[in-house]
Structure formats: C-alpha cells, structure tokens
Amino acid sequence: MNLRVLTVADLHQSGSHYRWLLDEVQAKRPDVVAFVGDVLNDPRTSQSDRVGTEDAAELLSNLPCPQLVFVRGNHEQEDWPKFVAAWPLHERPLVALSGAVHIVGPLVIVGFPCHTGWEEPWYETLPKVGNEIINDISLSGRKVLSADYEFWLSPLIRRFGPAASTLWLMHEPPQVREIARPYACNPRWTKAVERFRPLLTVSGHDHHTPMQYNTWHGELGATVCLNVGRGVMSLHYCVLDFEFPESKPCLPTRITVEAFPWKSQVVIQPK
C-alpha cells in the first residue's frame, strides 16, 4: 500500500504562500497534508500580504486533499480559537495533534507539542475538534501537555509499537546542524530522537538555515531530519512517498522524500 504526504511549515498567514500551496497540492495529489506549525502569524506582526484568520481557515479547509493534519507552532496563539471557529468542522475534521497520533491506514503520524509562545489557546480548542490530550498535567493552574516526553511519547511508543517510529512532526527541530541553528532547536526532542530512533522527523521554525546554506535535511544517528520551513520567493515543502507491506499500522518498506524547490531526493529503506 502506498501513501503520499505533503509536509509544509511556517506559512505565517501569507496569501502568496497559501496560493502556492494550493497549486502544489493540486499538482502533487497527496493523501495527507501535514502542517508543521505556524500556519498562522502573531497578529501584532506587520505583514503586507497577511490573510485574515477566518479567510485562512476557509482557504486551508478547501485544499483538495483527503486529510489535513496540524501540529502547533509558536505562532498558533490567540488567533487559533478564531481559526478553529471558522473551520467547517461539520464538513471535514480538523486534526490538531499535540502529543498524540493520527493513523492513516498503515501510517502512524506522531504530532509533538510546541511549548514556545502562548500555548493555552491551542489546548482549549482540542476538545472542540474531538482531539484528545494525552496525559495532560496541571501546571500553575493551566492545562498543558508536559514538556517531558516521558509523560506522553513513551506510552504512545508502547501502544503502537514500531509503527509509531515512522513519521514524527515537530515544529521545533532536533539539534541537527544542517537544518537549524542551535538556538532554534529543542534539546528534549533531540533526546527523544536519539532514544527512539524514528525513521523520519519533519520540522520548521528556523526559516533561515535552508535558504542560507541551501540545505533541507540532515541526520541524527539513523534518523533523517527534514526542515520544511518557509521560503521567501517560493514555497519550501517535502513530498513523502511511503510504501507499506500491508494496510494495518506497520513500518514502511521504503520512503522516498523529495524536497521542493530543490527537486532533490532522499530514499529511506528501513533495515
């Protein structure tokens, strides 16, 4: 069984980036579009081509793709509830992952939390869209997900087995020199990758490293780590083509990753 996932991050409510994404989704025909944080932008930020929050929800909810998956970035803050309210939940689900998984046939997608920025609005909306918070804790009166991955990631790995080490989505990248500067990385996620050794991680957050060094991937041990952070004059994204031996959750036999606009590939063949 084959599945195609298009991964993108850091659209920041840019009208031009939304339009470019629509064109690419129409051309690539993915089964899933995975938004790896910062589809919205801080409303206090000046931006010439900013799309309104309600318009952003309308544009993204109408993408011609069977499934859309979101993880939080540091800019999903006070406008996120407005985005959710404008989303046509009766027509298509809004899958918002935070320390949880989403299963598409044989593919198990793990969505990491993002604790940078004001995260409470995100957590407040999760019950409204039918997504659960795994092992949430009370911290100074706030309901949040623990920053310690032992509270939520380890139970997911135990529950779903090796299939849960296929694709991890995390806005803040692990510490991989080729895809992000050290201050943009999350050392906790680095430790999680080193411990559980997933096949593939996809991040954003650092917009500059891919453009400055013309790189989009690196390795942390046996794990291939991608940065699909924002381009300026074009859309940066990756298409992931998975080949699975069966239709129930399992590890793929092959993953072909193609990065755009570079049009270069990496092939992952699990041992």
Regions found by a protein language model. Give the residues of each.
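A short C-terminal boundary segment appended to hydrolase-like catalytic domains
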Residues: R181, P245-K271
